[in-house]
Each structure stands twice: as C-alpha cells, then as structure tokens.
A protein has these predicted regions:
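Cell-envelope/extracellular polymer assembly enzymes that use nucleotide-activated donors
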Residues: 3-5
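Short, glycine-rich nucleotide/cofactor-binding loops
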Residues: 7-13
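Short, well-formed alpha-helical segments that are part of the catalytic scaffolds
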Residues: 13-51
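Active-site-proximal specificity loops/subdomain of glycosyltransferases
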Residues: 36-99
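Catalytic-site signature of metal-activated, phosphate-bearing donor transferases
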Residues: 77-92, 102-103, 108-272
Length: 272
C-alpha cells in the first residue's frame, strides 16, 4: 500500500484540529501541520488560540509519533490566497511521502474508515495521475440542543460542490487545495464542514482570515446567519453561499445536535 502524508493548518481554527485529525490518524503515515511563527493569518491579522490545550491534545492523540509541527512565516504576501497557496505548497514539500491528503482543521471525516479501507486500496493505482475530491455537508448554526444544517428541498443534507483534497507531491497548489492537475475524481468521502457552525466571534474571525477573505467579507451570508434563530430558521430559502459562483443553499433543517452525525452517516449512499 502506498504511504500517505496528511497536511493541515494551525490557526484560529485550532480548537477543531485534534478532533479532525482523530478521524484519519490511523489511516495515514505522517501528519505535517503548519503554524505561522508570528501567529499572523493569511490575511495578515494576528490570531491566538489555546496553545497549551492543543499541544496537550496532540500529544495524547499522537501515540505513533506521526505528527510534525512546522513553524514558518506563512504570510509573505499581502494577498490572502497567495499565502494560502504558499503554506500548502510549503507543507507538501515537507512531506516524506508523495501521496498528499490535505484536510483542514474544521473538517470532520464522516466515513473515514470505509473510505480508507475500501475505496483507497481500489483506486491507489491512480494516485499520481488524478486529484481526488470529497463532498462537504455544512452545519449552519447550533442553538441550544439543536443544530441547523443546510439542506435540500427533500430535507436531506445539502452537498456542496466537490472540494479537492488529495494530490501527488509533484503537483502545485494553485488556489487553496486546487492544483495544476486538471484530472480530478469524486470519491465517496463525506466531510462535515464546521466553517459556519461556530460562535459569532469565531465566525467573524473566520470570514476575515480565510484564503478567500476578500470574497467572503462581501457576501451577505453572515447577516443571514446572525439573525437565524429557532423561530425563523424555516423562512430562510435559496440563500446565498459564501462567495463562490451562483450556487444557492435551498433551505435549512433542524436536527438534534446529538443526532447530527448519525443522520450524516445514514445519508452516505447519497454521496455520489
């Protein structure tokens, strides 16, 4: 079996990172994490996180010494997406192995075991030819013991446009996780993306610091998010995405937070 390197990022999303890594830790051979040495984001804003907690959580998780933290200047440009690309390529080049799995801190793999044990072995012969994509499911907002999730008209969780996440080391990240490789393949991997489902303070921080922050800051979705509550959530229809293309989010569904992951798993057959 071809060895796998995973890369991820430490910044304002650090509180999600250990849980994210835990989903794929057993299935990759090394994990390279990037952290700006000055604690400056891609958008050239300073950030803080609970470093003691993260180091403790990673130490507990890393029973096989797979994790390496690389601290460098990851904000050489004034343009956020250029810094995004720079860091991902830097981490890729630090990897020991050629098969690169890029999974961000706020991404939680729903069906990691099936993906790595069943799908990957069947398709690894193409590891140096085709980039792989997964599908996002996007929780919108947690309120009390409920979570609002972006959904389709039939109430199934809405699947976002596929996202690139696996490539060969010879390729170059050109726009976030999209590379110069034009050959891409959708995989059955489904990922809960916690990009929006966070506190108002943390969401504002996300909007102002992500690689496409220049786009996200101009998008109206934050006001929609801010005013959504348990009384009006069902009134939000065909609302705007976070800055890319003309895609719309059809509606929301309200589920018990404790049932969210079970529901996501039950809908895996809809991944393609």
């Amino acid at each position: 079996m071809i060895k796998k390197s995973a890369i991820s990022l430490i910044s304002y999303d650090a509180e999600y990172l250990a849980d994210s890594i835990a989903k794929y830790y057993d299935f990759v051979d090394e994990i390279v994490l990037g952290l700006d040495k000055d604690r400056i984001s891609w958008s050239n804003n300073s950030f803080k996180f609970d470093e003691n907690k993260l180091w403790k959580d990673l130490k507990t998780l890393d029973v096989k010494n797979k994790i390496e933290v690389v601290e460098e200047n990851f904000h050489p440009s004034k343009v956020a997406i250029e810094n995004d690309n720079y860091e991902r390529n830097f981490l890729k080049d630090k990897c020991t192995h050629d098969w690169i799995f890029s999974i961000d801190a706020d991404e939680e793999l729903v069906n990691a075991k099936h993906f790595f044990n069943n799908f990957v072995p069947l398709m690894e012969t193409y590891y140096d030819k085709v980039d792989w994509m997964f599908t996002w499911l996007t929780p919108w907002k947690e309120i009390e013991d409920k979570t609002l999730v972006i959904a389709n008209e039939d109430n199934s969780f809405h699947r976002e446009a596929p996202q690139g996440f696996v490539t060969h080391k010879k390729n170059t990240f050109r726009y976030a996780r999209w590379t110069n490789n034009t050959k891409q393949m959708l995989t059955p991997l489904v990922v809960l993306h916690w990009s929006l489902c966070r506190t108002e303070k943390n969401l504002k921080q996300k909007i102002n610091n992500i690689g496409h922050s220049d786009i996200a800051k101009e998008d109206p979705f934050f006001q929609n998010w801010k005013h959504t509550d348990l009384k009006n959530w069902d009134q939000l229809k065909n609302f705007k995405t976070s800055g890319f293309g003309n895609n719309q989010w059809p509606k929301l569904v309200c589920v018990d937070t404790n049932s969210l992951r079970h529901i996501a798993e039950s809908q895996l057959q809809l991944a393609y």
